[in-house]
From Swiss-Prot:
This is ATP-dependent RNA helicase FAL1. It comes from Coccidioides immitis (strain RS) (Valley fever fungus). It comes from the Eukaryota. InterPro entries: DEAD/DEAH_box_helicase_dom, Helicase_ATP-bd, Helicase_C-like, P-loop_NTPase, RNA_helicase_DEAD_Q_motif. A motif (DEAD box) lies at residues 174-177. The gene is FAL1. A motif (Q motif) lies at residues 25-53. The keyword rRNA processing applies.
Length: 399
């Protein structure tokens, strides 16, 4: 069910917003199309989350919008609903374009748009790298109301004139901080140049570093701002621990000791490099542990089937790089292990946010060598949080 996050945690989120932003307490108050409302309720949403109740009406009015939202707060549905409200399904042309940093996220967004727009006969295509270009060309030539994609492939399809931009009225940049961190700036600017001058721009980002704000000034006119108060990007409900490992080499034995605990539910283990993911996966398998792994170098088909197995619960332990850390919605994950602490502290909340899916309880365990102590302290300071040494009864915490 879509509507299974913790409402009380949601209600506690405090925002600083532009003065014209009001709160719509129900979806009915938003004056949405009848068939869209049917789709929203059929999808499992009962009432809007904090970000939805503030942002949807502003986006539907055509305002450029910057919304600060973490994974799991209902942000994907925020722009999915807004897009479905403003497009004209009688016109078989692309009217909204969503760019996101990973193929998995782009596909997940496509799934949400198709599901919520189920009664509207909407056409939405995921235009992503690593897939057959011929399929893209066929789908786009056929006509799609919405395209959800990664910047490189989208820019390519626009340049080849298969993705027609003249009817586009909304550009959504999801996980904008990560789009820029992954070096997509040039492709985003390329795409933007092809869009009609009056295109509305909606930016969603968990953090708002300088480069995100500088991009918004180039793309946006008098944007509405819906920002979570700094200290409310919360790690609430997540228990965070560290295990002191004297040397890097000892991390592996520590992980093996924890394996039985990991499989109580599902766990994700993060490493900082693709090479480390492959190395750890091989080593775990040699020791007869069942694990699956995923990183950005894998062919798209393989990544899709690994994600599907994990979503369906067929695999219990997934080893990954940060490619997985943004926005991938797997409800059962309640344990995250940072085998390596993230090199970028802003990724910490994305990684462990995976374990608490917005108000769901979760446990995060950080492996810390003596060299890592400084990074751990930096993370604690940055998030005003406390990370304690792990107690012996970690299995009880997951019960």
């Amino acid at each position: 069910m879509a509507d299974n996050f913790d409402r009380t945690a949601d209600e506690r989120i405090e925002f600083t917003t532009s003065k014209e932003v009001t709160v719509a307490p129900t979806f009915d108050d938003m004056h949405l199309k009848e068939n869209l409302l049917r789709g929203i309720y059929a999808y499992g949403f009962e009432s809007p989350s904090a970000i939805q109740s503030r942002a949807i009406v502003q986006i539907c009015k055509g305002r450029d919008t910057i919304a600060q939202a973490q994974s799991g707060t209902g942000k994907t549905a925020t722009f999915a609903i807004s897009i479905l409200q403003v497009i004209d399904t009688a016109l078989r042309e692309t009217q909204a374009l969503v760019l996101s940093p990973t193929r998995e996220l782009a596909t997940q967004i496509q799934n949400v748009i198709m599901a919520v727009g189920d009664y509207m006969n909407v056409q939405c295509h995921a235009c992503i790298g690593g897939t057959n270009v011929g399929d893209d060309i066929r789908k786009l030539d056929h006509g799609q109301h919405v395209v959800s994609g990664t910047p490189g492939r989208v820019a390519d399809m626009i340049r080849r004139r298969h993705l027609r931009t003249r009817h586009i009225k909304m550009l959504v940049l999801d996980e904008a901080d990560d789009l820029l961190a992954r070096g997509f700036r040039e492709q985003i600017y390329d795409v933007y140049r092809y869009l009609p001058p009056a295109t509305q721009v909606v930016v969603l980002s968990a953090t708002l570093p300088y480069d995100v704000l500088s991009m918004t000034t180039k793309f946006m006119t008098d944007p509405v701002r819906i920002l979570v108060k700094r200290d409310e990007l919360t790690l609430e409900g997540l228990k965070q621990y560290f295990i002191a490992v004297e040397k890097e080499e000892w991390k592996f034995d520590t992980l093996c000791d924890l394996y039985d605990t990991l499989t109580i539910t599902q766990a994700v283990i993060f490493c900082n490099t693709r090479r480390k993911v492959d190395w750890l996966t091989d080593k775990m398998r040699e020791a007869n542990f069942t694990v699956s792994s995923m990183h950005g170098e894998m062919p798209q088909k393989e990544r899709d089937s690994i994600m599907q197995d994990f979503r369906q619960g067929n695999s219990r332990v997934l080893i990954s790089t940060d490619v997985w850390a943004r926005g991938i919605d797997v409800q059962q994950v309640s344990l995250v292990i940072n085998y390596d602490l993230p090199s970028n502290r802003e990724n910490y909340i994305h990684r462990i946010g995976r374990s608490g899916r917005f108000g769901r309880k979760g446990v995060a365990i950080n492996f810390v060598t003596s060299e890592d102590v400084r990074i751990l302290r930096d993370i604690e300071l940055y998030y005003s949080t406390q990370i304690d040494e792990m107690p012996m009864n970690v299995a009880d915490l997951l019960g």
